[in-house]
Structures are given as structure tokens and as C-alpha cells.
């Protein structure tokens, strides 16, 4: 790490990672005994001099209170300097020196704070964790960011001391849930976390002279000091205490929120907070504390009653009790552990959730309970120690996994069949005999803990199945192409998903085994051998009719148990006769009438959606067996869906060249854009149109219509160069276009009229015009322009699109932020190369947000997306400077294609690298807002009017109750819904130093949904995201390479 790197933008005196200022533990030694080099390396003199140990974990003498830094050691706060991480401190001046080998040195006039790997440490003294922001601002923290993987590994290693002491490698299936060692930064809201903090035993003071006790799993502490928390497992004796409990300790590590006021930008100082400390008496267990909510609610707009597909869950139990179970001598077998615990149900009760080491009960037992069992394999007596470690509130994140298990049992009781992750009702299937399909209605369910509490989220789901089995499909293929039967079957079936009706399980077809049949034998789990015919007859009562059919092969993904043992290996063979393909066939997708019949049953209205939800709730609440199952854990599900108050954002004003107007209730301005001039129109002086001979009439009519409708729209176009092709082969198009561009290099635009939906022809034209001979191109299907009554409307839309591709500007909305750059990013998977992905990047270049700069980067799975992101951002900033002669002061990034599980990666890795880009330009520190956009959400919103539910109007925003507790997020319904129910978009503010309040974020996002020029109305996502998606899709689906840089300042990909 280069010590000369500049400080973190906007954070005076601090470096890139403000959360490193929170208290944490490292790998050092105790503070109350003479310093001894116990870690790795040599000892240094303990005379209090400034020279210190250079490896990891060395101390100097001192009897003052110490704190550990990184992997280093505690140092007395009276020393002139402290070596951070692994370096050797050097003599320093008053303002502190720099540790040349690795790291920064901190001035010790300020309180020292542990900054190891982000794990909060309970106070080592009354004054710790109370440093003022002013004091912390003086410190120079390291710029190097800790690896996310490394942090997770540390947590995994330090989770359970007792189990490690026994040498067990088991990992709890609940371990790590809700436990987050890192801290968030730069969100622009109150940092708060999901960490489980709190109900641990009182940290015990380590007596002077105490030493670590060696055990099979490494150094550990005597029994009276042992905890199940992220302790100092074998890394030396801790300073003052040992953590009890499996999560970060109470209450300094509030999940992802700061425990010590970090050095924040001025805009964030108001929102930062500290979690108050609390003292515990020895042996006392307290209820896990609850987290404060983030400031995320806006005020702009008109209040509106909003319904959602969330159902309130009430917890009648006062608490859920967590116990740690220790087997002495150790029992490796998980099955044996479960069996032993089952023998003691009279003690633990019938309602348990046990994962092999952690036990959850709705009832409270003694703090420590000893049970006796006999291991049947060798008659060895086993002592089972059950020790209470935490008292959880019933709505704790740690309880949600087994609540979902309870919910799955309830759905089974109601007669619903589990297919994949959702539950369906085959008895209520809708048969579409004309199309040989059937639709199973069902539900997707999960229990979530949101800002409003514990909710059951239910969405209506449909499973489309074919009435014909895979064997029937094979017979049809055989009749059509006997010579290439096997090849055609492979093309048709490989990669498709099938369901086996006898067990309602789905499988992906990976291959076809032509050399095997149902008459072949296989070995069962017990070692016996049987044929497929006998197996299905004996186990399912199914008689196989076709004895010579081949077998379908499914290769399961490699999975392993927590202990690392493989679960499924080899291949699974399926019978085509018993397998039915799922999903909509490709041929049917292209059939408009068939899709119309199907969508009638799939795209249900808001009224039908809520009716289905209420029917499910009625079935649950009127079924005694289901109620009994829920009552075992004290759960009670409400009988109605959630209704709360949302807001409708103010309508926006659309600005054309000389006209501006407020959008209507349906947020559509298709009439205005064709009768008034666009902001900027590019004259089409030289353009060419290519068409096959049989489409000559349609081409002439289209050109004539262009001339009639262009005037009112402000467009001026000359007569085109007409090129009539002798046929419609791909080679004919490519050769003709290339020849024309060579002979006439000033061609502004290429228009191609094609017959049919031909991907090969479209791809060849786009490769030529986007990569080899860069020129904007427009592809038109002849069917689109074959209906005279619609030709005028079609011609107007095509002209608008052509104007965009040439660099024209259609409309804009008023965005009051000055010197703003808005960026859109999306990722698409390249179809030509397995696992290769392509990132589309689009950035605005002017204050009206009407000029755009675009780039594309490709990367393999082992490459980080940020590498290409950085290149694109630097190029966009340079282009922005070339247009405006200054850099943007605020940058707002809309990032699509990020799931919840990847949010931390974005926060901890992508954003710091983006901030590093700004250092390329001297004295440049822009404000940054990073917003993740999620389209695939299971939250539905409804407008409420009495007992009736409908579709919310465009501009509806909901920023509370159903939002996530960890992030500043909101749901936005920006588009007008004509069919189906309201599916909003979730927007998550991952980073915000741009002083953008929740109102600013929501209104800016809504404004950006008006800026997609391919549609005169609002769309679901901000326009930069949609542009980036179109660009990434074109590059990954058809180009398979980066487009020419000459087209980067045009929207050629629309």
C-alpha cells in the first residue's frame, strides 16, 4: 500500500474505510501482563521505545489500557507512534509518521481504537468508544480495504469455540445468519444493521497470569471463560474479556452501523449515531436489542392508501431461546446427534429446531442442562451439555429460517405440492387443450423481517406444463426428421426443464443416453440391483409402456453438507415417458394468439391477485391442523393483507424544443412528440435503404410516408439511396451494405427492410454497422410496414428512433441539480461464450441529460466487473470534460443486475474502486450516489378504495413498512399498467455523499423514468439503466464484441 495516496474524498483526515474506526479485535495479547511476542516472529525490547515487533502480534511494555490494531498488537497510548498492521514504526514528528513497510502510523495523542477485521469488541474500559468526531478526524487510517472473503473466513473460524475445542468441523446451518462483521459507509442515512447483538453472558475478566489452555482444536480458554462468540480462538489471551454468544457483542457492534462516530462528510454528520452502551452482570442473559430504523421516508407528493402482498405475522411467544449443545466425547455423526437429542424430547419439548450444534426452543430451560445418552455403536456414555447462549426476540432474523420451514409444512397440510421453491395446486389446473398446455395455479411464499416487523410475503405464481410427455415430443420429431432424429432431439431438449409427475420434482436435461433403456438395471442406495421398470412399478405403481425409449440425463450441481461431505454425485436418469417439459415453447412465444390465450390466465389483475391471497389466508386460518402447526412456535397469521399509506409523486413537465407540458394521468405523450419539434433534430442528407426485390413496394411507401410526417416533428430528410437486393440472403445484405459504405463514406444511416424474424441476418447487419464499418443502422421487419392503416404511426416512431441514433435529442424533464452526471450500468450474459458476461455503460454528458456516452466491456467469470467499470467511467469523465470544459460535481449511478446477496460486494468493493478513479484527476472529489435498481421483486402494490383493490397510479412510491431494515430503499411504480397487477421497482441507495435526501432520490429516479426515448411515456426503470440494458443485450446477443468507439456518443443501440 502506497502511503502517499490521497485521503478519502470528502472525509478530511481519514482514508478510504471510515468503518475501520470502530472498535474491533485482532490477534494480539493481553494488556495486563508484560508484553511477550507470542504471535509470529521475534520479540523486541520492552523498554517502551518506539521500535516495535515487525511481524504479527508483538507488544511493548506498558501498563496503560491497550487496544489492538489489525493483526498487530496492543500498544500503550503513551507511545509516540503506533505501527498499524504489519509494519515497523519509524520515529515520527508531532503529527505522526509513516510506516514504510506496510501501513500508516497513527498519532497517539488521540484515543486508540481497535481496527482489526470489523468485529465489534465490548468496551475495555469506561472511556472506550466515546471519542469525539473531532478526535477521530485527526487519525490517519489505512487506505487498504479488507477482503470480504477474508472477513467471512474469520467469522466462520471464530463462530463456535466449544465445537472447535472438540475438533469438530461441523458448521451450523444457521451460523452466520444476521451476523455481519463489516460496517457500512457513505449511505447518507442512519447506519443501522441486522447484526445479532446483545443477549450474551457477561464478559468475564481474565485473571492476571491466565494462559490459554491447549485443546484438540487449538488454544482455548478454561471452561469458566469459554464463549461461543467470535472470540480470540487460540490467538493469545484477550484483553479483559471473552465473548459469549455467537454474534457480535452487545451493543457496540450494531450489525452494520457504526459504534464510534466515524469521520463522515458534513452531510452525513447529522445522521450518524452511536449505539448506547450497557453493562451486564455476570451470568445475566438479556433480550437481543432491536435496531433503529434508517431515515428513508420522504414527504413530497399526495398520500394514498396502498395495499401490498405482505401479511402481518404476530408472535405470541415472549422469546426464542438459543442453546449451544456440546457432546462429550465428541459425536461426529450428525444423524447420531439428532437421534440423541430426540431421545430427550421430554426435557426439551416437542417443538425444537436443531442443526447439530445450535438448538432453538420456544421454552426456557435452565441456563446449563446436562443430559446423558449412550452411543449405540460402542455403548459409550455421552454427556450432552445444553447451555443457554442467547435470548432472541421472536421476530429475530435467526428465527426466520425455521419459521419458513413451519410455513412449508402448513402449505403441505393445505394440499399444495412443492415444485421447486413454490407451492402449486394441480387439482385446480387450467387445461388449454387447443395448445396442449396446462397451467397450475400456486403461490410463492416467504417470511421476511422488514422495517414494519415480521411479514409473510405471498405472490401468485403459475407453472406452465405441456400435456405431452418428452416421449411424445420425441415421436413428433422422429416423424418430421428421421435422418437427423438424434441431433434434432438434442437441440430441442438439452437445457429444458422437465417435471416428473410422480414426485413433482423438476430437473434440467443435460444429456440423452441413447444406449440405455428402462430394461437396464441400476444400483439402489441399499446396494440392491433392479431395473427401471421394476423400480417404478414397485415404488409408484407405474407401468412403463415403451421399453426401448432412451434415458434422459440430469447432472446435479455439486452440493455439500456443512461438514464438507458431498450430498449428490453422479447422474440421475429419467424416463421420457414420465417427464413433462415446463415453460412456454419457443414456437408458442412467437404466436400472438396463443400467447394472448395464455396470458389471460397468468397475468391476473390486482383484484384477482388480492382475491387469491385472501383465499389462501382463509384456508390457513380455517384449517385446524395448520393452526396447530403455527401455534407450536406461537405464530399467528393475519386474515387480511397489509394496507398502509404511500405517496403519489408530483407529475413531471416534459420539455420539447419550444413547447413544454405536464404529463397526464397515464404519463403518455405520444401525441405531443409527433406534432411538435424535438429538442434537436439531425438533418438526414445522405442515407441509404436496402430491401429485397419483393419488398420494393413497401419500401417506396415507407419512404413516401417519411416525407409526409417528418415536417411537424422538426425533421428534414432528403431522398435516400435506394438499393434493391436480388434476394434476401444474409450474404447479399452484407456485401451490398459494405459496398455502398465503401463507395459512399458519408452515409449517415443505413436502413434495412427484412423478411421475417431472422436472428442470423440481424446479427450480420449489426456486426457490420456497429463493429466493422461504424454507422447507425435501422432494421425494419416488412410485416411492421405492411398494414396501410398503421403505416403513418409506424413511420413516425421509426423517424424518432432514427433521429436518436444520429445523435438527436427528443425531450427532457427539469432536473434542478447542476453539473450532474447520471450513469446507467447493466450486465448481460454473452450467448456465444459460456459464462462470459458483457457490461453496458451509459453516462450523460450535458445538463439537460440529452446527450449520452456509451461503452461496452466483456469479462470472464473470474474477472471483476469493476475493472471494466473503471475504464468506462474514466472515459466518460474525459468526454464530459471535453463537452463542458469542467468535470461533474455530482455523479449518480444506477446499477442494474445486482441481487440482494451481491449488495455487500458492491458496497465493499465496487464503490471504493470507483472513488479511486477520481484520483486520476488532480483535486477532483465529486459527490457520489450509487443506487441499485432491482426489477425482479416479489412485492406487489395495490391501490385501495374501500374493499376494492386496483392498480396504483404512476408515480406511486412506498418507502416504509415493507422496506429493508439495512438499506435506504424504496419501491417505485413509475409506469402505467394496462394488464396485470402493479409490480414496482425496488431502488436501494447503497452509497450517498451527494446530499440527496430520500425525497431527492425518489424524485430524481422518477424523472429518469421519463427519459427513455424509445417510448413516449414512463418505463419501470430509470432510462440510463434501460439504455445500458439495450446496449449490453445487443453486444452480448448479436455483436459478441465491443462496438466501434466512433458510435460511443450516439444511441445507436435503440
Swiss-Prot record:
| PANTHER family referenced in this protein's UniProt entry, alphabetically | EUKARYOTIC TRANSLATION INITIATION FACTOR 2C
**Domain Piwi spans what residues?**
749-1040
User: Could you mention a single GO BP entry for this protein?
Assistant: transposable element silencing by piRNA-mediated DNA methylation
Record's keyword terms, sorted: Cytoplasm, Developmental protein, Differentiation, Endonuclease, Hydrolase, Meiosis, Metal-binding, Methylation, Nuclease, Nucleus, RNA-binding, RNA-mediated gene silencing, Translation regulation
Query: EC?
Result: 3.1.26.-
Give the function comment from the record.
Endoribonuclease that plays a central role during spermatogenesis by repressing transposable elements and preventing their mobilization, which is essential for the germline integrity. Plays an essential role in meiotic differentiation of spermatocytes, germ cell differentiation and in self-renewal of spermatogonial stem cells. Acts via the piRNA metabolic process, which mediates the repression of transposable elements during meiosis by forming complexes composed of piRNAs and Piwi proteins and govern the methylation and subsequent repression of transposons.
Q: Does the keyword Nuclease apply?
A: yes
UniProt subunit comment? Component of the PET complex.
Q: Would the keyword Glycosyltransferase turn up in this protein's UniProt record?
A: no
The taxonomy runs:
Eukaryota, Metazoa, Chordata, Craniata, Vertebrata
Gene3D superfamilies, sorted: 3.40.50.2300, paz domain (2.170.260.10), Ribonuclease H-like superfamily/Ribonuclease H (3.30.420.10)
Provide a GO CC annotation, any one: pi-body
**PTM comment:** Methylated on arginine residues; required for the interaction with Tudor domain-containing protein and subsequent localization to the meiotic nuage, also named P granule.
Q: Which family does it belong to?
A: Belongs to the argonaute family. Piwi subfamily.
Instruction: Report the top EC class in one word.
Output: hydrolase
GO terms of molecular function = metal ion binding; piRNA binding; RNA endonuclease activity
Instruction: Report the subcellular localization.
Output: Cytoplasm; Nucleus
Catalytic residues at: 826, 864, 896, 1029
Q: Which residues form the PAZ domain?
A: 469-583
Cofactor(s) recorded for this entry are: Mg(2+)
Name the record gives this protein? Piwi-like protein 2
Amino acid at each position: 500500500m502506497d502511503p502517499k495516496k490521497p485521503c478519502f474524498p470528502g472525509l478530511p483526515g481519514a482514508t478510504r474505510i471510515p468503518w475501520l474506526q470502530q472498535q474491533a479485535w485482532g490477534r494480539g495479547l493481553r494488556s495486563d501482563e508484560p508484553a511477550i511476542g507470542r504471535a509470529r516472529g521475534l520479540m523486541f525490547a520492552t523498554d517502551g521505545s518506539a521500535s516495535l515487533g515487525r511481524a504479527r502480534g508483538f507488544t511493548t511494555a506498558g501498563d496503560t489500557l491497550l487496544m489492538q490494531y489489525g493483526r498487530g498488537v496492543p500498544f500503550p497510548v503513551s507511545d509516540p507512534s503506533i505501527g498499524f498492521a504489519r509494519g515497523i514504526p519509524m520515529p515520527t514528528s508531532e503529527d505522526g509518521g509513516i510506516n514504510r513497510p506496510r501501513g500508516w502510523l497513527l498519532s497517539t495523542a488521540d484515543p486508540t481504537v481497535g481496527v482489526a477485521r470489523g468485529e465489534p469488541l465490548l468496551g475495555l474500559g469506561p472511556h472506550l468508544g466515546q471519542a469525539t468526531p473531532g478526535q477521530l478526524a485527526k487519525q490517519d487510517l489505512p487506505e487498504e480495504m479488507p477482503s470480504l472473503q477474508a472477513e467471512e473466513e474469520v467469522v466462520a473460524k471464530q463462530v463456535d469455540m466449544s465445537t472447535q475445542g472438540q475438533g469438530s468441523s461441523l458448521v451450523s446451518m444457521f451460523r452466520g445468519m444476521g451476523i455481519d462483521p463489516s460496517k457500512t459507509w457513505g449511505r447518507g442515512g442512519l447506519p443501522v444493521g441486522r447484526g445479532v447483538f446483545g443477549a450474551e453472558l457477561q464478559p468475564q475478566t481474565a485473571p492476571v497470569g491466565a494462559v490459554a489452555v491447549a485443546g484438540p482444536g487449538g488454544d482455548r480458554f478454561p471452561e469458566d471463560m469459554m464463549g461461543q462468540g467470535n472470540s480470540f480462538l487460540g490467538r493469545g489471551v484477550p484483553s479483559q474479556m471473552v465473548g459469549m454468544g455467537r454474534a457480535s457483542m452487545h451493543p457496540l457492534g450494531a450489525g452494520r452501523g457504526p459504534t464510534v462516530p466515524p469521520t463522515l462528510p458534513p452531510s452525513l454528520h447529522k445522521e450518524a449515531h452511536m449505539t448506547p452502551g450497557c453493562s451486564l452482570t455476570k451470568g445475566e442473559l438479556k433480550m437481543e436489542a432491536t435496531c433503529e430504523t434508517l431515515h428513508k421516508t420522504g414527504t413530497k407528493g399526495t398520500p394514498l392508501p396502498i395495499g401490498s402482498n405482505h401479511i402481518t405475522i404476530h408472535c405470541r411467544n415472549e422469546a426464542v431461546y438459543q442453546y449451544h449443545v456440546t457432546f462429550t466425547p465428541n459425536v461426529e455423526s450428525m444423524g447420531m446427534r439428532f437421534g440423541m437429542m430426540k431421545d430427550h424430547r421430554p426435557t426439551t419439548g416437542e417443538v425444537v429446531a436443531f442443526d447439530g450444534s445450535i438448538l432453538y426452543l420456544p421454552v426456557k430451560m435452565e441456563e446449563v442442562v446436562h443430559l446423558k445418552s449412550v452411543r449405540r455403536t460402542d455403548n459409550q456414555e455421552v454427556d450432552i451439555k445444553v447451555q443457554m447462549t442467547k435470548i432472541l426476540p421472536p421476530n429475530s432474523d435467526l428465527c426466520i429460517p425455521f419459521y419458513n420451514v413451519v410455513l412449508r409444512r402448513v402449505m403441505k397440510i393445505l394440499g399444495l405440492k412443492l415444485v421447486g421453491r413454490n407451492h402449486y395446486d394441480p387439482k385446480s389446473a387450467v387445461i388449454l387443450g387447443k395448445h396442449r398446455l396446462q397451467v397450475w395455479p400456486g403461490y410463492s411464499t416467504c417470511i421476511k423481517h422488514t422495517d414494519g416487523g415480521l411479514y409473510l410475503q405471498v405472490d401468485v405464481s403459475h407453472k406452465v406444463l405441456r400435456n405431452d410427455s418428452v416421449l411424445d415430443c420425441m415421436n413428433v420429431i422422429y416423424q418430421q426428421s428421421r435422418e437427423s432424429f438424434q441431433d434434432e432431439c438434442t437441440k430441442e431438449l438439452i437445457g429444458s426443464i422437465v417435471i416428473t409427475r410422480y414426485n413433482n420434482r423438476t430437473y434440467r436435461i443435460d444429456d440423452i443416453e441413447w444406449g440405455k433403456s428402462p430394461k437396464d438395471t441400476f444400483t439402489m442406495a441399499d446396494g440392491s440391483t433392479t431395473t427401471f421398470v421394476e423400480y417404478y412399478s414397485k415404488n409408484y405403481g407405474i407401468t412403463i409402456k415403451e421399453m426401448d425409449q432412451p434415458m434422459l440425463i440430469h447432472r446435479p450441481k455439486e452440493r455439500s453438507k456443512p461438514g464438507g461431505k458431498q450430498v449428490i454425485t453422479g447422474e440421475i436418469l429419467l424416463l421420457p415417458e414420465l417427464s413433462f417439459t415446463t415453460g412456454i415453447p419457443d414456437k408458442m412465444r412467437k404466436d400472438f394468439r396463443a400467447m394472448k390465450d395464455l396470458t389471460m390466465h397468468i397475468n391476473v389483475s390486482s383484484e384477482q391477485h388480492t382475491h387469491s391471497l385472501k383465499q389462501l389466508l382463509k384456508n390457513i386460518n380455517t384449517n385446524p391442523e395448520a393452526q396447530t402447526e403455527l401455534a407450536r412456535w406461537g405464530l399467528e397469521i393475519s386474515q387480511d393483507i397489509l394496507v398502509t399509506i404511500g405517496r403519489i409523486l408530483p407529475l413531471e413537465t416534459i420539455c420539447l424544443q419550444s413547447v413544454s407540458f405536464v404529463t397526464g394521468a397515464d404519463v403518455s405523450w405520444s401525441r405531443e412528440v409527433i406534432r411538435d419539434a424535438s429538442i434537436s433534430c439531425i438533418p438526414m442528407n445522405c442515407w441509404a435503404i436496402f430491401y429485397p426485390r419483393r419488398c420494393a413496394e413497401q419500401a417506396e411507401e415507407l419512404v413516401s410516408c417519411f416525407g409526409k410526417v417528418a415536417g411537424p416533428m422538426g425533421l428534414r430528410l432528403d431522398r435516400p439511396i435506394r438499393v434493391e437486393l436480388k434476394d434476401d440472403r444474409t450474404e447479399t445484405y452484407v456485401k451490398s451494405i459494405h459496398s455502398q459504405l465503401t463507395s459512399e463514406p458519408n452515409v449517415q444511416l443505413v436502413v434495412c427492410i427484412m423478411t421475417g424474424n431472422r436472428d442470423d441476418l440481424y446479427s450480420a447487419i449489426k456486426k457490420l454497422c456497429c463493429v466493422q464499418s461504424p454507422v447507425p443502422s435501422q432494421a425494419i421487419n416488412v410485416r411492421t410496414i405492411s398494414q396501410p392503416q398503421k403505416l403513418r404511426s409506424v413511420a413516425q416512431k421509426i423517424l424518432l428512433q432514427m433521429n436518436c441514433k444520429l445523435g438527436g435529442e427528443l425531450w427532457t424533464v427539469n432536473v434542478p441539480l447542476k453539473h450532474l452526471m447520471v450513469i446507467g450500468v447493466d450486465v448481460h450474459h454473452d450467448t456465444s461464450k459460456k459464462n462470459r458476461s458483457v457490461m453496458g455503460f451509459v453516462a450523460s454528458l450535458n445538463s439537460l441529460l440529452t446527450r449520452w456516452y456509451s461503452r461496452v466491456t466483456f469479462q470472464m467469470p473470474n474477472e471483476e466487473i469493476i475493472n471494466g467499470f473503471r475504464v468506462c467511467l474514466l472515459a466518460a469523465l474525459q468526454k464530459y470534460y471535453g463537452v463542458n470544459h469542467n468535470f461533474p460535481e455530482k455523479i449518480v449511478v444506477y446499477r442494474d443486475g445486482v441481487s440482494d446477496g451481491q449488495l455487500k460486494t458492491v458496497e465493499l468493493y465496487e464503490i471504493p474502486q470507483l472513488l479511486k478513479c477520481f484520483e486520476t484527476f488532480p483535486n477532483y472529489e465529486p459527490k457520489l450516489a450509487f443506487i441499485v435498481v432491482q426489477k425482479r421483486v416479489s412485492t406487489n402494490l395495490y391501490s385501495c378504495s374501500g374493499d376494492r383493490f386496483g392498480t396504483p397510479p404512476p408515480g406511486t412510491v412506498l418507502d416504509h413498512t415493507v422496506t429493508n431494515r439495512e438499506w435506504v430503499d424504496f419501491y417505485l411504480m413509475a409506469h402505467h399498467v394496462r394488464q396485470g397487477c402493479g409490480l414496482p421497482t425496488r431502488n436501494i441507495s447503497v452509497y450517498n455523499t451527494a446530499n440527496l435526501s430520500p425525497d431527492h432520490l425518489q424524485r430524481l429516479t422518477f424523472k429518469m423514468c421519463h427519459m427513455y426515448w424509445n417510448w413516449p411515456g414512463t418505463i419501470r426503470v430509470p432510462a440510463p439503466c434501460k439504455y445500458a440494458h439495450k446496449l449490453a443485450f445487443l453486444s452480448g446477443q448479436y455483436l459478441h464484441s465491443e462496438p466501434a468507439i466512433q458510435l460511443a456518443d450516439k444511441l445507436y443501440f435503440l
